[in-house]
Amino acid sequence: MISRREQEYKMIGLTIAYYRKLKGISQLQLAELAGISRTHISNIEAPNMPTSISLETLLDIADALDVPLSSLVDFKQ
């Protein structure tokens, strides 16, 4: 059974993938803009591999996507 925390990581990853695709950029382009590896972006976005993410990395990704941090973590609607 997936834990609540794992479910939250999964939702963050899916939200990042959504905004990345909406912006029309690849995982590699996002990784370069955020200053992290493409593999890390891939792991974060993978719904079958909930990956923890540091606040610093999350802020870097939000900046790279030009979205507020809250839009990446506000999935409780």
Predicted regions: what is each one?
Residues D66-Q77:
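Short C-terminal boundary/hinge segments that cap the last helix of small helical domains
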